[in-house]
Amino acid sequence: KEKKLLGTGGALHSLKKKKVKDFILLNGDTIFDINLNDLIKSKKKNTIGSIALIKNNSNKDNKKLNNLKISDNILSYSKNASLMNGGIYYFKKDIFKYIQNKNISLENEILPELINKKIICGKKFNEFFFDIGTPKNFLKADKLLYKHFFKPAAFLDRDGVINFDKGYVHNKKDFKFRPGVVKGLKFLSKNKYYIFIVTNQAGIGKKIFSLNSFIKLHLHIKQILQKENIFIDNVSYSPFHPDAIIKKYKKNSSTRKPGNLMIEKIKKEWHLNLSKSFMIGDQNSDKICAKKSGLYFEFANKNFFSQAKSIIKRNQ
């Protein structure tokens, strides 16, 4: 907590004490639905970082950093340039050389210095952008943000749908994507679907593998999919089973399919277009779970991409 106002720049000074290295900074009054990996990759060697930019067309009354252009990833000013600051930044720790413990503006003082020295990069994005920094936009926020994030969802079982089910899959060696999965997940993302994994993982409760092993495997899956610009929005798992060895997991739970508590929790936390949402599974318990939550259901077929494409066509 600041003892005195330090501005958008001076407030960052407190991070210096925490020995921060690379970091992402987001303005609190903007929504910019971008791929952060693309922003990170846009930074060139021997620069401080990179700024996410948006075309300044419907934001004429916006007073944020503007009149910007990009040349070979390096950011500069130009009188008639159409790009403006989108409020998301990737910085190296070297940024702290330019941040003092005083009231100072990031956009009006620090960033202009970096731009003039040609040591800051920029990356243009065309994704959804909304700034509540003006009274007019603030009044529009609820309706526009709800509309943007109101999307259908694909609820997917994991073993037997995402990967081949070899029984209690919990390491990289045994994990293998089923045919069409990567292409199908990319297709779902392109068509603005949330992607949720809902999986029974009794192996955790039975001590066949650890929770840490489960998490490590999903980090591995995440790394593979990120290279394809695919992002799983949520992974829900149920470690419960009546025959579990670990006491806290030895019980019946509505999170375990055919119970539908995993799905119901997701429904409460996300703005979902349920009429176009669906579930793919490989067990009758998946089908029962989907029915309880009012979701269209199909058993996994031979090719995930073909199946996902067919379901989306059906929903149009």
What annotation goes with each model-predicted range?
Residues 23-24, 31, 37-44, 56-60, ...:
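Catalytic-core segments of class I nucleotidyltransferases/pyrophosphorylases
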Residues 1-66:
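Conserved beta-loop-beta/alpha segment of the NTase-like Rossmann-fold superfamily
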Residues 15, 29, 68, 92, ...:
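Residue-level signal for inorganic ion chemistry
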Residues 152-194:
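Active-site neighborhood of HAD-like aspartate-dependent phosphohydrolases
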Residues 26-30, 201, 282-283:
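Active-site metal-binding loops of divalent metal-dependent hydrolases
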Residues 212-215, 219-233, 243-279, 283-316:
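Asp-based, Mg2+/Mn2+-dependent phosphohydrolase catalytic module
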Residues 181, 185-221, 231-244, 290:
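Substrate-recognition element of Asp-dependent hydrolases with the DxDx(T/V) motif
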Residues 5-6, 30-33, 129, 161, ...:
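A short, conserved beta-strand element in the Rossmann-like catalytic core
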